[in-house]
Amino acid sequence: YWMMLGDFNAVSRADNIIYGFDEDNKAFLVHDYVSGNTPYIDIVDRLHPGDFQKSTFSGRRIDFIYMTEPLFRKVRSAEIIHDGYPTSCRDPRGVTKFCYPSDHYPIIVNLKF
């Protein structure tokens, strides 16, 4: 079983209906390579085809979880969480520009072995 995940700072061609980028845009290079040259599956896209789910406040999906097929068969659900976690918070010390735990939404994956 293999998994690769994180902030790729790139976008998936599968989401281009949202972005409207030219087909030769370099923003696709990372995911084009992963999808064309590795056994990894974009699990959020596979489980929610056509249902764009942003992973950042800016409205892009740049955080991904990729898995090989054997591990993907163990996935029961996967989703990007938009409730609760990114809610504004206050720092009692008055630190400025520190109002969110992250500028990315968490991705939750449930696996069953």
Language-model-detected regions and their locations in the chain:
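Metal-dependent phosphoester-hydrolase catalytic domains
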Residues: 1-3, 10-113
